[in-house]
Design a protein with these regions (language model features):
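Hydrophobic alpha-helical transmembrane segments
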Residues: 18-23, 72, 76, 106-111, ...
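Juxtamembrane helix-loop-helix connectors linking adjacent transmembrane helices
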Residues: 4-81
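Aromatic-enriched alpha-helical transmembrane segments of multi-pass intramembrane proteins
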Residues: 58-70, 105-107, 167-175
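Transmembrane alpha-helix/helix-exit interface in multi-pass inner-membrane proteins
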Residues: 29-45, 86-94, 122, 128
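Functionally important transmembrane alpha-helices
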Residues: 117-175
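Small-polar-interrupted transmembrane alpha-helices in polytopic inner-membrane proteins
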Residues: 78, 82, 105-120
């Protein structure tokens, strides 16, 4: 209740702002890819490598989509629910509270992006996920509408699930 007050979730952004949010996120993909290359060059200790390997095996199992029903299910659990839930938590609540604490929207965006990435417990995707979190944070800050990063987040995850389903591509680098 208290934390969700002031999020203006009843205010829809309109299709233009939603599309603009998606385009802004897509425009940041080169930065995200660069951060992936930097992240990939950081050596991991053996325990982290093992952890990454287990996480990748789990993701491969989840993203093996043999039927349209499994594809739709994955869109719901990997795109729609995280788009809503993670944005409510990390941008709507955490970023907002950190902003109030530090009196700095930029600090709030980057601290919440760091926590967003850390919570995912994937070392090899840490920097690109943090960059995506920052982009989503800036979308929320600039528009003042939480639906914009929710839609962009769901689109980002959904397009990756759809690409894997349609192409049968290897998901080793799925973030």
């Amino acid at each position: 209740g208290k934390f969700l007050n002031g999020l203006n979730l009843d205010v829809r952004p309109g299709w233009q702002l939603s599309i603009l949010g998606i385009f802004f996120l897509m425009a940041a993909y080169p930065l995200v890819n660069l951060s992936f290359l930097v992240n990939e060059s950081i050596p991991l200790p053996a325990w982290a490598d093992k952890f990454e390997s287990q996480a990748e095996d789990t993701l491969k199992a989840i993203l093996t989509m043999n039927t349209p029903v499994i594809f739709i299910f994955n869109l719901i659990i990997i795109a729609i629910l995280p788009g809503i839930g993670e944005e409510l938590i990390f941008r709507g609540i955490l970023q907002k509270q950190i902003g109030l604490l530090f009196k700095s929207p930029v600090a709030a965006i980057w601290i919440s992006a760091f926590i967003f990435s850390a919570i995912h417990l994937q070392f090899e995707g840490f920097l690109p996920r943090m960059a995506l979190g920052a982009v989503l944070g800036y979308l929320y800050y600039w528009t003042g509408n939480l639906w914009v990063p929710i839609i962009a987040h769901a689109f980002n995850n959904g397009i990756q699930v759809a690409l894997i389903y349609v192409t049968g591509m290897d998901i080793s680098n799925f973030d």
